[in-house]
C-alpha cells in the first residue's frame, strides 16, 4: 500500500486503474528477485492468480523484500545445498531459494512425529535448537541466514571462515540424524528396561518376544483386571517389527499413543510397564499352580 501511495502522488501521479494492472504484472515478471510476505509476516513461496486477486483487494496485507544471497550468505546457502546433495550455485533466484529450503520444512512437518517435535533427549543441545528454529520460522531468509547459524552457535563473523561454514553444515547433518533416530532411541531405552526387569538376556526382538509370550501363555485371563487384560492381549499379539509391539504395549501403560510421550513421562511409563509385566508373571504362576492342582501334580 505504501508503494501505491507513492506512485499515485507527485511526481508520478499514476492512475489507479493503471497500477491495478501494472503492479501485479511487474511482480510476476520480477518474481525471482524478491521474497513475498503476507499480513501476519508469513513467507509466501509461490505467486499465483489467487495472490494477484487478493493483492488488488488488500494491498496493505502484503510486503516484499529483495532476495539477498551474496558473500557469506552464498557460502551458507551452498552448504545447505550440499547437505541436500544438489549442485552449488553462483547466483540465486527465488525458485532456487524455495527449492533449497523446502526440504527442511518438509522434514520438520512430515517426517518428525509428535515425540520428535517435543523431546529434548538428544546427545547435543544444538539438535533441539535446530528443530525449534524451524518450528517457529516465518521469514525463511532470516531463518536460514541468521536464526539457524545463531541457534547453532555460529555468529556472522565466524562464518566468514569457510572451515566454519563446513562445520555449520556438519552440525546440521548431525541434528537431522539425531532427530530421525530419537524415537527409536526412546524404544531402545524402554526395551532395555523391560528385558532387564524380566531377566531376559536375548536382545533380538524376534527371539525375546517368543520367550515373553511363552512365559505368559498360561495366564488365566479371567483373573485379570480389564486394564491388565488389555495389556496382556497387546503382549501376546504378534507384530512383525519391534516398533509396533512396543507402541502396542505402551499404549495401555501410557493411556495414549507412545509418540505423544513427553520427557517427564518416560520414567513413569517404564515403571508402569514393568509393574504390569510383574502382574502378568504373578498370574501366570497362579494359573500354572491351579492347572497343576487340578491334574493332581506337585508344582515347583
Write out the residue ranges for each language-model feature.
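Long low-complexity, intrinsically disordered regions
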Residues: 6, 10, 29, 64-300
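C-terminal engagement modules used by replication, chromatin/transcription, nuclear envelope/ESCRT
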Residues: 35-86
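Charge-enriched amphipathic alpha-helical scaffolds
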Residues: 4-44
Amino acid at each position: 500500500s505504501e508503494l501505491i501511495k507513492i506512485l499515485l502522488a507527485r511526481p508520478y501521479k499514476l492512475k489507479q486503474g493503471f497500477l491495478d494492472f501494472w503492479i501485479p504484472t511487474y511482480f510476476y515478471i520480477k518474481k525471482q528477485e524478491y521474497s513475498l510476505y503476507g499480513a501476519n509476516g508469513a513467507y509466501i513461496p509461490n505467486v499465483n492468480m489467487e495472490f494477484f486477486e487478493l493483492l488488488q483487494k488488500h494491498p496493505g496485507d502484503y510486503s516484499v523484500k529483495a532476495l539477498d544471497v551474496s558473500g557469506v550468505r552464498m557460502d551458507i546457502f551452498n552448504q545447505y545445498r550440499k547437505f541436500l546433495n544438489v549442485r552449488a550455485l553462483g547466483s540465486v533466484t527465488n525458485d532456487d531459494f524455495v527449492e533449497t529450503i523446502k526440504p527442511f520444512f518438509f522434514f520438520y512437518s512430515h517426517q518428525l512425529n509428535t515425540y520428535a517435535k517435543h523431546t529434548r533427549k538428544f546427545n547435543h543441545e544444538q539438535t533441539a535448537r535446530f528443530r525449534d528454529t524451524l518450528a517457529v520460522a516465518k521469514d525463511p531468509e532470516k531463518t536460514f541466514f541468521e536464526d539457524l547459524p545463531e541457534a547453532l552457535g555460529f555468529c556472522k563473523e565466524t562464518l566468514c571462515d569457510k572451515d566454519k561454514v563446513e562445520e555449520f553444515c556438519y552440525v546440521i547433518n548431525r541434528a537431522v540424524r539425531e532427530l530421525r533416530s530419537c524415537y527409536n532411541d526412546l524404544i531402545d531405552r524402554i526395551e532395555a528396561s523391560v528385558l532387564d526387569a524380566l531377566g531376559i538376556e536375548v536382545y533380538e526382538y524376534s527371539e525375546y518376544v517368543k520367550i515373553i509370550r511363552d512365559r505368559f501363555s498360561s495366564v488365566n485371563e479371567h483373573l485379570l483386571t480389564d486394564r491388565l487384560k488389555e495389556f496382556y492381549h497387546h503382549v501376546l499379539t504378534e507384530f512383525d517389527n519391534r516398533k509396533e509391539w512396543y507402541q502396542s504395549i505402551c499404549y495401555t501403560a501410557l493411556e495414549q499413543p507412545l509418540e505423544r510421550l513427553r520427557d517427564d513421562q518416560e520414567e513413569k511409563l517404564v515403571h508402569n510397564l514393568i509393574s504390569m509385566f510383574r502382574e502378568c508373571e504373578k498370574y501366570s504362576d497362579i494359573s500354572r499352580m491351579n492347572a497343576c492342582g487340578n491334574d493332581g501334580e506337585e508344582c515347583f
